[in-house]
């Protein structure tokens, strides 16, 4: 569904990206439409803005959903204090149950539950739009504007990739953590998939 939205949303975001270029816009250009990460790259290409000016907001809801499952299932409880969310929201999401005591199988199970939680809500007859609007949109945007740690997509290695970061006077500060090899491999796979999207 998200990639089906890409063509139309890319056209729309390109209009605003060109307006930003024409007006020599110097603020943040924040993308909240799906698919967030590829649209950020489209904005960067069309706008002439610096990569630090473009930011995507889609990962916050994935982090919030992971917290929900971590509170409900003791197997995922380590996510509450040591867990992290990376990448886009959707199929290429990467969750780590813990960065200190990473369990690949548990992390993949949590990732699968979170990535498909919206489908479970739809089965119950609800369209999940409030949680993303708050977690990825309003709350994450406010944290970003205040210079506080939050989940958003920033430019990294030629793609926009979601991770915990904050805006400082010097630019974007990404959270730096020692990551286990299995987690690094998952992140590389996600980056490669994002890079393949035109």
Stretch-by-stretch model annotation:
Residues 20-21, 60-63, 114-116, 196-197:
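Short C-terminal domain-edge/linker segments immediately following a structured domain
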Residues 31-101:
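Rossmann-fold dinucleotide-binding core
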Residues 7-11, 15, 38, 133-140, ...:
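Conserved active-site and cofactor/substrate-binding residues in soluble primary-metabolism enzymes
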Residues 15, 19, 42, 69, ...:
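Alpha-helical scaffold segments in soluble metabolic enzymes
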Residues 72-198:
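Long, compositionally biased stretches enriched for glycine and/or charged residues
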Residues 15-20, 41-45, 111-118:
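Short amphipathic alpha-helical segments, especially helix-boundary/capping motifs
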Residues 28, 34, 136:
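Short alpha-helical basic/polar micro-motif
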Residues 1-27:
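Rossmann-like NAD(P)-binding element
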């Amino acid at each position: 569904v998200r990639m089906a939205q890409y063509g139309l949303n890319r056209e729309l975001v390109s209009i605003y990206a060109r307006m930003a270029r024409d007006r020599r816009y110097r603020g943040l250009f924040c993308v909240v439409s799906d698919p967030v990460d590829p649209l950020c790259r489209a904005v960067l290409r069309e706008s002439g803005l610096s990569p630090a000016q473009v930011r995507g907001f889609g990962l916050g809801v994935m982090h919030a959903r992971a917290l929900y499952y971590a509170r409900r299932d003791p197997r995922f409880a380590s996510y509450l204090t040591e867990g992290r969310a990376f990448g886009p929201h959707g199929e290429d999401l990467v969750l780590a149950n813990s960065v200190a005591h990473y369990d690949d199988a548990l992390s993949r199970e949590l990732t699968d539950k979170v990535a498909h939680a919206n489908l479970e809500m739809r089965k119950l007859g609800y369209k999940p739009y409030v949680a993303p609007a708050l977690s990825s949109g309003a709350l994450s945007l406010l944290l970003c504007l205040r210079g506080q740690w939050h989940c958003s997509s920033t430019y990294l290695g030629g793609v926009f990739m979601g991770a915990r970061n904050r805006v400082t006077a010097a630019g974007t500060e990404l959270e730096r953590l020692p990551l286990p090899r299995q987690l690094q491999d998952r992140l590389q796979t996600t980056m490669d998939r994002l890079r393949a999207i035109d």
